[in-house]
């Protein structure tokens, strides 16, 4: 069988490529352009114009916008606006856009929220911690006796953020409440306030019957370079101690320490037992580092070598390496 001549093949390809287009081919091309390409192009241009105009007209909601929604919005929109309010308050105050009139309006809306969806009041109490203003302190102190426990907890965290020592006696009172969750929140709130009454109150909480209240007290003291809670920190680092307390029993986020403020206030999903254990150990390790408590070096060395959580190991490594460099 004769082999095809390469030159002949190339000639045929060139002839086909340069051959005149038939009328039928031209008609088909025009139909495709008319019924497919042109309509699609028109749709894409219209979509681009719509999106462009949308981006030009959409404005970021301000704190005033959210506050107005809380006043006049529907059932769901009110609590959602209260939730979002906290995300913009801090920045707007930093930029000087929060004036006296807004603070007064925020207080009035909070006071009027008593018969509303409890979430509105909870999130408003939390939002008050995102800005500092003396007028908010009295309102938050009054909210410590709110019938809704979550609102009380949020108010305690916001009082810590305000940094006003007027809240100290009220938080000390709650630190002896029958509810361990409220006691823990009060201890955390006290830890952020500078007042002579705070250290004795935290030292008293080191003997609380609830472990996580004791842990919080030890951490708050350590943050102030007070080593009165060193024994409690040692307990937290003891092998099997956390597991022996039923840490993996699925208890709620509210009843565990060392979450971020948003977690404690119920604004994030419940953490897994593994993450809760990790957070507890890492916070305890950091506290040991703050106190330069080298007597607990063996516990840190064990965590560095044997703990199953790599982040816990890393936290221990950082403290131990820091000690070696000194």
Per-segment meaning from a language model:
Residues 56-70, 91-113, 133-145, 164-176, ...:
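Amphipathic alpha-helical scaffolding segments comprising HEAT/armadillo-like alpha-solenoid repeats
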Residues 86-90, 129, 160, 191, ...:
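Structural signature of alpha-helical solenoid repeat scaffolds
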Residues 81, 124, 155, 186, ...:
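Conserved hydrophobic register position within alpha-solenoid helical repeats
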Residues 1-24:
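N-terminal intrinsically disordered, acidic low-complexity segments at the extreme N-terminus
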Residues 73-74, 114-117, 147-148, 178-179, ...:
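Short inter-helical turns and helix N-cap capping residues of alpha-solenoid HEAT/ARM repeat scaffolds
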Residues 72-75, 79-130, 134, 180, ...:
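Extracytoplasmic/periplasmic/luminal assembly and interaction segments
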Residues 34-54:
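Hydrophobic membrane-insertion alpha-helices, especially the h-region
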